[in-house]
Each structure stands twice: as structure tokens, then as C-alpha cells.
Curated annotation (Swiss-Prot):
This is NEDD4-like E3 ubiquitin-protein ligase WWP2. Its EC number is 2.3.2.26. InterPro entries: C2_dom, C2_domain_sf, E3_ub_ligase_SMURF1, E3_ubiq-protein_ligase, HECT_dom, Hect_E3_ubiquitin_ligase, WW_dom, WW_dom_sf. Autoubiquitinated. Ubiquitinated by the SCF(FBXL15) complex, leading to its degradation by the proteasome. Residues 152-171, 200-210, 222-243, 263-272 have a biased composition (Polar residues). Pathway: Protein modification; protein ubiquitination. The modification Phosphoserine is found at residue 211. It comes from Homo sapiens (Human). It is found in: Nucleus. GO terms for biological process: extracellular transport; negative regulation of DNA-templated transcription; negative regulation of gene expression; negative regulation of Notch signaling pathway; negative regulation of potassium ion export across plasma membrane; negative regulation of protein transport; negative regulation of transcription by RNA polymerase II; negative regulation of transporter activity. A cysteine residue is required for ubiquitin-thioester formation. Changing residue 498 to R: Does not affect FBXL15-mediated ubiquitination. It catalyses: S-ubiquitinyl-[E2 ubiquitin-conjugating enzyme]-L-cysteine + [acceptor protein]-L-lysine = [E2 ubiquitin-conjugating enzyme]-L-cysteine + N(6)-ubiquitinyl-[acceptor protein]-L-lysine. Detected in heart, throughout the brain, placenta, lung, liver, muscle, kidney and pancreas. Also detected in spleen and peripheral blood leukocytes.
Length: 870
């Protein structure tokens, strides 16, 4: 009967994992409100395991969905297949129906065979809380052939846990470590044939002892199924043991005894061997363990759910109660995983340290590594403490002696790897530049990789992180060491360099992905307001994707540029009472002191601040610009009396008259107060504390003029300006703009438009000059030789803005209405050119040579503050 103990080729065992070929043919789902064509796929899951879940490709069909795709699955004879038919949509997928297949029932009904078997499954779907029929799904199964004779009575399979077996004598069947040549089954797997002895196996549980009370006290005879698999005390494969009903199974439940099952221990997945039982007449051990050698009495801890056992011949194997499998190899330590590279070689992944190794890890290996790492960390800490034993410990007192003073609110200074950087907790960003020196008005920024520091004596020096050197010499062009803390010896302005520095800050702080803004042209303002204010400020740094509802198109930048242009035209429209024109004939905008007529005006100003910051951050332009004093306020610069001339000429002339005349001789009684009317309500504001009783005299006249000028720029707009700057600072920190002056900021926000030279010359008028005068010819020659940036600066120098109205130079607006570009002959040849922005007039002295005119003109448009600096 020796042949009876060998497994038959091409026959699988009920609990052996094998490959199943599943062919998904077609489906006829019942779908309400059916679309003409459906894009669908089928998802198949084995026993609900994510690792055994596969999908077909997507196919398009109408009444009948066709796939004809083959899927290979790893199953056992008791596996359950869950099939789901999905319909693909743009936003989400829709479940058309589900079906399930119990392979054990299929095998029972077909004599243990699945050879190209066709199944038509009824799909089920949920409709209003009830399960209804959802159509049909046709599949083919081609897979394992299971010998049902190994099961008691030759019929039913068990429900999922491998059951132990006993021979006819009642003694346990245990394997012997003598191997036979392997045979190949029909699924490509390999099964080994071994001889077994009748000795019982010893058990060494790793997770604790089982209570004897949990065991059944009733013995049941084992029915002979007629199969001679237990003849002469031998069974197929390894390691297989038998158990008595009194002995609990390895999964902790008592089940009827079953026939012996083949098990193939391997590093992957195997069947679960049952625990051994004592011989007839012996009482079971209450501890479930036997005396082991000293080396085995204190084994290394196994992962949860694992157990170590030993065969009679002394060979150790391991039981995984989680997956009900056995293996010869000891389980990996926690956090380790075994993988295979493309060349079929095994390697091991340590998820704890995110490292890989070819060597199989053991508990001793992990302990040695942890011990080495602990010693290494202790040694590094000791070395760091040793290297810093003579260093001066930093404290809060050191910041008190910092020549630059304390950091701005919300900023923190840190140092990693020897280099200092700064953290802005307000915007959650970091930077190398010191915010106290970044963008100083009198100093341009340091070159990339440079840093400014101070010695304990307060002497400034510079660190070049590129070459790791230090120097007292200022690396910026035109700066001399030790001259006024680095004030420029020769003026050097590069708007292009500043702009690239700003763009670098924007790109280095950009966030991934994109943000969608969907608006309608009819409700552009409100749609944009609601969406921008509902977003987190930092999300507005993501790439913009603008959608115009009702219009088809993809936004690759063009729609965003149009959105900025259209929305800026809306939000800055004076009809909303948020902004007003700076003057009757000045098309630049300033905040309207009467904006409080709108109860939500501060929220709108916060929104506009975010919007303007987005325009700068994303490099887009707006339609209309602000006044230069407003740009100065954004840069935290103090407006001057000269700035008042362009926005309120009458007020400016009044202050100039007070400045140039003796108030005591004129008999004027002025006090440090000023009246203001808003919406018909007159309010009085004190320029200084107790100003109502302080009279203006010749001694305090300068203070009065300064306070009056400041009040004129801030009257009634303090809250609005703060809300605007808060919204701006949420998206882009205002510190990033400190490199620029107010005119450069206007250029960056409003854009640099191309200038038509022929239109400029044709629309220019002359006073005390003619177009044939040599100074005029030299002037136009210089302008033609300029690049577009300098032409814009010349236009800004004369007209006060870099933007041209619709219609070009012929439509320029002055203080008294339309005013063309004018060149007037004024002054001596030693004078610099002067401009009158209210009248679009350039005072050009009669220079004697082309070189002199070019030098004076270029110097004037660069140095626009203060005249007569020869």
C-alpha cells in the first residue's frame, strides 16, 4: 500500500494554494437612466485580501459589456471570489452590481474539478435600501482539481482551518525528515513526498499555555473514508501531525477530525500543521509543552501570533496562527520585510531604519545593531559636548547687544550645521536673509550665498558660504568698506536683478499642485471674493487654474492673465466706493476714506490685499495702479511733502505757502488740529496730544508741516490700509518687497508696456524749443538709444506713472484735463532736468553737447529725489 501514500500528479489538496485562471467574458447590467455608452471594468477580490485584488481593463459598451480578459488568482479550495462591476465617470465611479463565488461549492457540485467551467452570475445592487437584481455576469473558471476523497465521507470541505488527523491505531502521525523526489501539480507548484513515523511531535508554544479545560472530553472514533492514505502509518508531504479530539487545534477551536492533509513548508505560505497528541492512555500535559534543552528554554521572542515547534527528529518549524501557515524559516523581526529584486534575488527591507540588506536579519543581528547605534549616539553626544566645552553659551542676553536690535514680531533665529537662517512664524516660511537688513532702502541685497554678521565690538563683516571665507570688504558693487555702514559710493540700480531676486523668493516658497478658481464673467467680483476668502492664504501660492463658467478652455496662463486684468478693473472701480481717484484729473487710485459706507469694507480690503499679493507672486499685471504714496506705505516708507503735490495740489500749495511765509507777520492763528468731512459729517483731529491748545509759530512750524503731511496721507484710511496690508502679508510677506522703491513696485505690478516712439514724438509739444532744435534732436536720439525699461522710467519721471491711457500719448491727462507730453526750455546748462508730473512737463536746460544732455538726463531719471546734486 505504499503507493497509496503518494499524492497523485495533477491533483491538488483542499487547503493548498493554487493558481486559478478567471476569464471575465461579459456583463448585462440593469442600469436606470442608461447612457448611450458606458465605460466600465470588473474588480475581483479573493477572500477580501487587498493583495489578491485585481481589475480588468476599461471597456466601452452599451447594452452588453464585453471584456474577454484573463486574470490569474492565487486561491485555495475554500476561497471566496467577490466580483464588482464598476462604471467609470469623471468625478466618481458607480457600482453597477456585485456577485460572489464560493469555490468549495463549485468544486462539490462538479466533482472537485474546474476545467474551463462557464458560470453565469446574478449581479446584485442596492436600490433605495433594498437589494435588487442588477443583471448578469458571465465568467469562465479554469483551475485546481481537488481530490474530494481526502475529505471524510468523500464530500464536504471544512470551513477554513486545517484539521488534524489520526491513523486507525489512534496514534499521532508525525513526519520524518527523509525526502522523496518532488512531483509537480497542475498549478505549477511542487509537492514533496516523505515517509513518517508514528512518534508524537513536541510542541513549544511562544505565546503562552492553553488551559486544559478548553479541550473536549469526548472521544469520537475516526471514520475510515475508504482511502488508504494512512496505510502503514505514512502520509504525504511534511510536516503533518495528528491530534486527538481531546487536544485543542492550533487555532484554538475543537473540530471533527479530518483526513491527513499535505503540507509543504516553504518561505512563502504553507498549510498549518496540527499539534501532536499523547499516545493512547496518556494524560495530556497541562502546560502543553515538554522539557526542552537549555538553549530552547529561553528563545528569542517571536512576533505576535507565531509559535515554535519541534519535530521528533529535532527539526524546528514555525506556526503562524494569523495566516494558519507553517514555515521552516524563523519569522523576520518586527518591521522587516522580505522582497525579491528583478533578477530574482532575495533582499530584506528594514522599515524601522529605511535600509536594505542582503543578509537575513535575526534577533541577535537586530540586538547588535541597536546596541551599536546606541553606543554611536552616546559617542556623538559626548564628542559634541567635548567640542563645545570652550564655546560661549548663547543666551537671551546676547540678543540684547545685537547691533541690529530685536527681530520683528513672529520671527525666530535658528542655526543648523553652522549656518544661520530665519523662521517667519507668521507665514510659516524660512529664509537665509536677516529680516532686519533685508531690503533696506539705502542698501541693495547681498549676492547669493553671502551673509552679513557683526563682531562682538559691533564691526560688520561678510561671510561667503560659497567659498567658506570671511572678509571685511563689502561684496556689493560700488560699496566701500567702512563708509557709512556700506552706503554706496556710486549709485548702482538694477531693477532686473531685484526682480529676479523677488521671483527667486516666490519660486522657492511655491507649493505643489494647483488651485482652481471658477468664476462667471457676469459675477466676477463676488465669485472671486467668495472663493479667495474661503481658501487658506498659503493655498493661493499654488499654480492658478482659472475656469470661466460657460466657456471651454484650458488655463495655461492666458486665462489667469485675463482674470487678473478683469478683476483688477472691477475691484478698483471707484463706483464701489472702496477707492477713489487721487485727483479730478488723476487716474491713479487711493483708498476712499468714506468706504465705511459699506459695512463689510474691511473684509473687501483684506480680499484686495490678497489679490494684489497674488498678482505680484504669480507675476501677473493689474489694469490700474495706485498712487506713489500708497506704494510707499506698502514699503513702510514715509511719504514726503513732494508726494502730496501729485494727489492734492491745493493742499500742497497751502502747505508750501505756510512754509515760505512768516505766520506771525500774516496774523494767522493756526493750531495743531485739522477738520475732515466724511459723508457730510465733520470731525476734528488733533495732530498731537493737546493740539487744540497749541498754536503754530515759527519755532514749531516744521513740526506742524510734518504732522499735517502725515495726517493728509492717512486721514480716515488707517483701518482700511491695515486690512489691505494684512491680506497682502498673508500671501506674500511684505519683507520681500523691501528691495524695491515705490516706482519699481509700480512697474512690477502694472507691467512694462512697449512704447511707440513715433506716437511719442508726434504727440509731444515744445515750449521755447522747436522740433528742429539741437537739444530736442539730441533728446530723441538719447531716448531711441534707451532700452524699454529706461523709457518707462523716463515716462514715469515726467508723468508720474508708467501706464498710458487708452489712446496713447495723445490722451495723457494733466491737472487741467488732457495734457500732452511737453518739453520746456528752462534753467542753465549746469542744472539737472526737472519734471512737473501734474502737467506732464519736462524742463530741459539748453545743454551744449549730446554727451552732457545724456549724462544729466540719465542721472535725473535715476535720482528722482532731490535736485541740484552736482
Amino acid at each position: 500500500m505504499a503507493s497509496a501514500s503518494s499524492s497523485r500528479a495533477g491533483v491538488a489538496l483542499p487547503f493548498e494554494k493554487s493558481q486559478l485562471t478567471l476569464k471575465v467574458v461579459s456583463a448585462k447590467p440593469k442600469v436606470h437612466n442608461r447612457q448611450p455608452r458606458i465605460n466600465s471594468y470588473v474588480e475581483v477580490a479573493v477572500d477580501g485580501l487587498p493583495s489578491e485584488t485585481k481589475k480588468t481593463g476599461k471597456r466601452i459598451g452599451s447594452s452588453e459589456l464585453l471584456w474577454n480578459e484573463i486574470i490569474i488568482l492565487n486561491v485555495t479550495a475554500q476561497s471566496h471570489l467577490d466580483l464588482k462591476v464598476w462604471s467609470c465617470h469623471t468625478l466618481r465611479n458607480e457600482l453597477l452590481g456585485t456577485a460572489s463565488v464560493n469555490l468549495s461549492n463549485v468544486l462539490k457540485n462538479n466533482g472537485g474539478k474546474m476545467e474551463n467551467m462557464q458560470l453565469t452570475l446574478n449581479l446584485q445592487t442596492e436600490n433605495k435600501g433594498s437589494v435588487v437584481s442588477g443583471g448578469e455576469l458571465t465568467i469562465f473558471l479554469d483551475g485546481p482539481t481537488v481530490d474530494l476523497g481526502n475529505v471524510p465521507n468523500g464530500s464536504a470541505l471544512t470551513d477554513g482551518s486545517q484539521l488534524p488527523s489520526r491513523d486507525s491505531s489512534g496514534t499521532a502521525v508525525a513526519p520524518e525528515n527523509r525526502h522523496q523526489p518532488p512531483s509537480t501539480n497542475c498549478f505549477g507548484g511542487r509537492s514533496r513526498t516523505h515517509r513518517h513515523s508514528g512518534a508524537s511531535a513536541r510542541t513549544t508554544p511562544a505565546t503562552g499555555e492553553q488551559s486544559p479545560g478548553a479541550r473536549s472530553r469526548h472521544r469520537q472514533p475516526v471514520k475510515n473514508s475508504g482511502h488508504s492514505g494512512l496505510a502503514n502509518g505514512t502520509v504525504n508531504d511534511e510536516p503533518t501531525t495528528a491530534t486527538d479530539p481531546e487536544e485543542p487545534s492550533v487555532v484554538g477551536v475543537t473540530s471533527p477530525p479530518a483526513a491527513p492533509l499535505s503540507v509543504t513548508p516553504n518561505p512563502n505560505t504553507t498549510s498549518l500543521p496540527a499539534p501532536a497528541t499523547p499516545a493512547e492512555g496518556e494524560e495530556p500535559s497541562t502546560s502543553g509543552t515538554q522539557q526542552l534543552p537549555a538553549a530552547a528554554q529561553a528563545p528569542d521572542a517571536l512576533p505576535a501570533g507565531w509559535e515554535q515547534r519541534e519535530l521528533p527528529n529535532g527539526r524546528v518549524y514555525y506556526v503562524d496562527h494569523n495566516t494558519k501557515t507553517t514555515t521552516w524559516e524563523r519569522p523576520l523581526p518586527p518591521g522587516w520585510e522580505k522582497r525579491t529584486d528583478p533578477r530574482g534575488r532575495f533582499y530584506y527591507v528594514d522599515h524601522n531604519t529605511r535600509t536594505t540588506t542582503w543578509q537575513r536579519p535575526t534577533a541577535e543581528y537586530v540586538r547588535n545593531y541597536e546596541q551599536w547605534q546606541s553606543q554611536r549616539n552616546q559617542l556623538q553626544g559626548a564628542m559634541q559636548h567635548f567640542s563645545q566645552r570652550f564655546l560661549y553659551q548663547s543666551s537671551s542676553a546676547s540678543t540684547d547687544h545685537d547691533p541690529l536690535g530685536p527681530l520683528p514680531p513672529g520671527w525666530e533665529k535658528r542655526q543648523d550645521n553652522g549656518r544661520v537662517y530665519y523662521v517667519n512664524h507668521n507665514t510659516r516660511t524660512t529664509q537665509w536673509e536677516d529680516p532686519r537688513t533685508q531690503g533696506m532702502i539705502q542698501e541693495p541685497a547681498l549676492p547669493p550665498g553671502w551673509e552679513m554678521k557683526y563682531t562682538s565690538e559691533g564691526v560688520r563683516y561678510f561671510v561667503d558660504h560659497n567659498t567658506r571665507t570671511t572678509t571685511f570688504k563689502d561684496p556689493r558693487p560700488g560699496f566701500e568698506s567702512g563708509t557709512k555702514q556700506g552706503s554706496p559710493g556710486a549709485y548702482d540700480r538694477s531693477f532686473r536683478w531685484k526682480y529676479h531676486q523677488f521671483r527667486f523668493l516666490c519660486h522657492s516658497n511655491a507649493l505643489p499642485s494647483h488651485v482652481k478658481i471658477s468664476v462667471s464673467r457676469q459675477t466676477l467680483f463676488e465669485d472671486s471674493f467668495q472663493q479667495i476668502m474661503n481658501m487658506k492664504p498659503y493655498d493661493l501660492r499654488r499654480r492658478l487654474y482659472i475656469i470661466m463658467r460657460g466657456e471651454e478652455g484650458l488655463d495655461y496662463g492666458g486665462i489667469a492673465r485675463e482674470w487678473f486684468f478683469l478683476l483688477s478693473h472691477e475691484v478698483l472701480n471707484p463706483m464701489y466706493c472702496l477707492f477713489e481717484y487721487a485727483g479730478k484729473n488723476n487716474y491713479c487710485l487711493q483708498i476712499n476714506p468714506a468706504s465705511s459706507i459699506n459695512p463689510d469694507h474691511l473684509t473687501y480690503f483684506r480680499f484686495i490685499g490678497r489679490f494684489i499679493a497674488m498678482a505680484l507672486y504669480h507675476g501677473k499685471f493689474i489694469d490700474t495702479g495706485f498712487t506713489l504714496p500708497f506704494y510707499k506705505r506698502m514699503l513702510n516708507k514715509r511719504p514726503t511733502l513732494k508726494d502730496l503735490e501729485s494727489i492734492d495740489p491745493e493742499f500742497y500749495n497751502s502747505i508750501v505757502w505756510i512754509k515760505e511765509n512768516n505766520l506771525e507777520e500774516c496774523g494767522l492763528e493756526l493750531y495743531f488740529i485739522q477738520d475732515m468731512e466724511i459723508l457730510g459729517k465733520v470731525t476734528t483731529h488733533e495732530l498731537k496730544e493737546g493740539g487744540e491748545s497749541i498754536r503754530v509759530t515759527e519755532e514749531n512750524k516744521e513740526e506742524y508741516i510734518m504732522l499735517l503731511t502725515d495726517w493728509r496721507f492717512t486721514r480716515g484710511v488707517e483701518e482700511q490700509t491695515k486690512a489691505f496690508l494684512d491680506g497682502f502679508n498673508e500671501v506674500a510677506p511684505l519683507e520681500w518687497l523691501r528691495y524695491f522703491d515705490e516706482k519699481e513696485l509700480e512697474l512690477m505690478l502694472c507691467g512694462m508696456q512697449e512704447i511707440d516712439m513715433s506716437d511719442w514724438q508726434k504727440s509731444t509739444i515744445y515750449r521755447h524749443y522747436t522740433k528742429n532744435s539741437k537739444q530736442i534732436q539730441w533728446f530723441w536720439q538719447v531716448v531711441k538709444e534707451m532700452d524699454n525699461e529706461k523709457r518707462i522710467r523716463l515716462l514715469q519721471f515726467v508723468t508720474g506713472t508708467c501706464r498710458l491711457p487708452v489712446g496713447g500719448f495723445a490722451e495723457l491727462i494733466g491737472s487741467n484735463g488732457p495734457q500732452k507730453f511737453c518739453i520746456d526750455k528752462v534753467g542753465k546748462e549746469t542744472w539737472l532736468p526737472r519734471s512737473h508730473t501734474c502737467f506732464n512737463r519736462l524742463d530741459l536746460p539748453p545743454y551744449k553737447s549730446y554727451e552732457q544732455l545724456r549724462e544729466k538726463l540719465l542721472y535725473a531719471i535715476e535720482e528722482t529725489e532731490g535736485f541740484g546734486q552736482e
